Amino acid sequence: MIKKLNKLIKNFTLNELRTGLKVTAKELVNKKITVQFPEERTPISPRFRGLHALRRYPNGEERCIACKLCEAVCPANAITIESKMRDDGTRRTTQYDIDLFKCIFCGFCEEACPVDAIVETQIFDYVFESRQGSIMTKERLLEVGSQNEQVINQTKFEDAKYK
């Protein structure tokens, strides 16, 4: 009987409504944690794995030696490499494609590369106009690498103490 009376009093006084309004009022005056994304950026870890890039040596030559270790270690089979022997006896890639829809951004390709040719940059805001746009060709990868070489070197330097 007393439980029913307590329940009736709580329902009559709208106790749950007051509790909810109290929580709402408290959150109204608290500091906002939302970031207005395109205008504001949050800090990114130096170990963040984003868009891929192929690097070049300072003399302009591609670093990739077509060893295909990155292709072999990729758990998602997102990397496709075709290579050809050059006149000087070295092997170079003729095709280096990464399907970003398949890629799980695990970083195994970067770890497997013996010459630091493939890296994952800190670029995370990119879009594709079509399904074909998700395939990063060798030319696009080299372009990303050339445009971001200074940032890549800086993040490699910051990350070196953890390896």
Swiss-Prot record:
GO cellular component: plasma membrane
Catalysis performed (reactions): a quinone + NADH + 5 H(+)(in) = a quinol + NAD(+) + 4 H(+)(out)
InterPro entries, per the entry: 4Fe4S_Fe-S-bd (IPR017896), 4Fe4S_Fe_S_CS (IPR017900), NADH_quinone_OxRdtase_chainI (IPR010226)
Cofactor: [4Fe-4S] cluster
Residue sites binding [4Fe-4S] cluster 1 per the record: C64, C67, C70, C113
Cofactor binding comment, as recorded: Binds 2 [4Fe-4S] clusters per subunit.
Tagged with keyword Acetylation: no
UniProt subcellular location: Cell inner membrane
GO biological process, one term: aerobic respiration
UniProt keyword annotation of Membrane present: yes
Key words, A-Z: 4Fe-4S, Cell inner membrane, Cell membrane, Iron, Iron-sulfur, Membrane, Metal-binding, NAD, Quinone, Repeat, Translocase, Ubiquinone
Domain 4Fe-4S ferredoxin-type, chain residue ranges per copy: 54-84, 94-123
Membrane topology: Peripheral membrane protein
Top class in the EC scheme: translocase
EC number: 7.1.1.-
Family: Belongs to the complex I 23 kDa subunit family.
Assembly and binders: NDH-1 is composed of 14 different subunits. Subunits NuoA, H, J, K, L, M, N constitute the membrane sector of the complex.
Protein name: NADH-quinone oxidoreductase subunit I
